[in-house]
Amino acid sequence: MGEPKDSLALFLCHESESSLNEDDDETIERSDKQEPHFTTTIDDEDYVADLVLKENLRFETLPSKTTSSSDRLIAIDWILTTRTRFGFQHQTAYIAISYFDLFLHKRFIGLQKDETWAMRLLSVACLSLAAKMEERIVPGLSQYPQDHDFVFKPDVIRKTELLILSTLDWKMNLITPFHYFNYFLAKISQDNHSVSKDLVLLRSSDSLLALTKEISFTEYRQFVVAAVTTLLASSSTSSDIRLTREEIANKFGSISWWTSNENENVYLCYQRTLEIEERKHMTPPPEIAVSREPPASGSGAKRRLSFDDSDQSSPPAKRMRRL
């Protein structure tokens, strides 16, 4: 692995802004309402098999870079908190976190002590892009909650969006577990009607977002993660949660493209997920700093750093004026 690129320089983007020319200060309501991804049905066998084939062809396990786990947790926590604030769909937050992970694997950022603002800026830009891909009502860039220590102007967020788009080669339509949820649920719940379908889908979505704090988008194929979260969400009793390889194979045995390789990958991810859940129950959750509203103005209020593209290459500690 090479030397880390200058994290500040990474956020200087020279792309044209013409493709992101919306009014950044206003909420946009799109006429092409986006539908949730878990609309796949049991009749879509060929469609799902094609998705799996694409995943298998494109999948590449990428090594972890040096971005600290605490920095990543803070970023994910902000994305999840902001999702709730705006009422975004679960898949919008998941896609934002996926953009975040993919970007960091392609452009490793070695943060210095006073450069944690770069992770927050990346979080804002990733969620904004995901909202533009998934949501019908898209907030303006100035409406995203800001940290009390610094403020990002819309132009800076838009330039970071362009950097993300360029880094990901403009491939923003990701295959996610949401494409598979209905399909797997139909396959594994044929003999279990004790848990409602809507409840299982909600459990799967909640479990998936919680799992993003432990597992990166780049570690597993998305159908593997979908199969595991659906298995756990559809369990009606604690005895259902400890499945063997053979029991998992039986759950998915009716799927034409399911092989021993798929079964092994799902089993290993399943075991890891159970270990994560057990560890959570044994260990108190760490305190993660989350974004709060700026304090009221007054003599005791902390001054906020303001970021715009005119002084973006300057050290954050020197940018004390609000422009």
UniProtKB/Swiss-Prot annotation:
Listed name of the protein: Cyclin-D5-1
UniProtKB keywords: Cell cycle, Cell division, Cyclin
GO cellular component: nucleus
BP GO terms, sorted: cell division; DNA endoreduplication
Transport is among the record's keywords: no
Family note: Belongs to the cyclin family. Cyclin D subfamily.
Species: Arabidopsis thaliana (Mouse-ear cress)
Region (Disordered): 17-36, 281-323
SMART domains linked: CYCLIN
